[in-house]
Amino acid sequence: MKVKVIPVLEDNYMYLIIEEHTREAVAIDVAVAERLLEIAGREGVSLTMVLSTHHHWDHTRGNAELAHILPGLAVLGADERICALTRRLEHGEGLQFGAIHVRCLLTPGHTSGHMSYFLWEDDCPDSPALFSGDALSVAGCGWHLEDTAQQMYQSLAKTLGTLPPETKVFCGHEHTLSNLEFAQKVEPCNEHVQAKLSWAQERDDEDIPTVPSTLGEELMYNPFLRVTEDAVRAFTGQVAPAQVLEALCRERARFQPAVEPPQPQVRALLALQWGLLSTHQKK
């Protein structure tokens, strides 16, 4: 199983998962169809399926264009709001392409129809992979926008947190540096946070993705997976796990640094990349 990490938009990740024997491929969270097709063409693979983690535009805006270019393409997810959806998936459902298996894990919290995807390959020594969208990120998680903190706790602690610790975690955004800065505020004495933050700063300086992490690593430095730890409880002033999680989300929202609006030239470049502006002007 080969995973191509594809940075797009401002800080999103798309993924192309390749079955190296059959040359079949599955895409996850198609934000920019043209970029995905470019990578697929370069790899010489046949794209057979799109898996969307949730319906937000920055994870699905390329679905319709891709489905138009590739008639018969399966576009799958758990939420009817997903653009160009061809079939709705259920929690625990299994999919397969070649020797690669996919287990669909419903992880509500960020959105009510958020689905994460757990992949492994037959007779392969590589670690399994989790494509977690905005449910779980490196040292963080997505805001719970449509569900309760209890549902989000269930998703993080029970559904994802019990997967094998060697599982590689591929998330939907590059928010690692700010997530770790917040984690350091929550647990200033956590050596795992400090070490990961130093590593992430080096990656950021070199403009290198910080994905994947592993689930075992996340359990050591991600405060949203550490809601039963004394230091995290003390930071929030709460004891019950769901209440700790909700307090963390509130504090993380306050901690989010203010971002200066981009300059006009930068806005134009982003608009071109997002397909909101054409390079061909009418005369």
Swiss-Prot record:
Q: Which residues bind Zn(2+) 1?
A: 54, 56, 110, 134
Instruction: List GO molecular-function terms, semicolon-separated.
Output: hydroxyacylglutathione hydrolase activity; metal ion binding
Where does the record locate the signal sequence feature? none
Pfam families noted in UniProt: HAGH_C, Lactamase_B
Q: Recorded E.C. number(s)?
A: 3.1.2.-
Kindly indicate whether the keyword Plastid belongs to this entry: no
Name a biological process GO annotation: methylglyoxal catabolic process to D-lactate via S-lactoyl-glutathione
The cofactor note reads:
Binds 2 Zn(2+) ions per subunit.
The cofactor named in the record is: Zn(2+)
Any idea which UniProt keywords this protein has? Hydrolase, Metal-binding, Zinc
Q: Which InterPro entries match?
A: Clx_II_MBL (IPR035680), HAGH_C (IPR032282), Hydroxyacylglutathione_Hdrlase (IPR017782), Metallo-B-lactamas (IPR001279), RibonucZ/Hydroxyglut_hydro (IPR036866)
* UniProt: Zn(2+) 2 binding residues: 58-59, 134, 173
- Asked if the Swiss-Prot or TrEMBL record annotates the protein with the keyword Metal-binding, the reply is yes
Role this protein plays: Hydrolase acting on ester bonds.
Q: Which family does it belong to?
A: Belongs to the metallo-beta-lactamase superfamily. Glyoxalase II family.
> Under what name is this protein listed?
Hydroxyacylglutathione hydrolase-like protein
Q: What organism does this protein naturally occur in?
A: Mus musculus
Its taxonomic path starts at: Eukaryota, Metazoa, Chordata, Craniata, Vertebrata
The gene name on file is Haghl
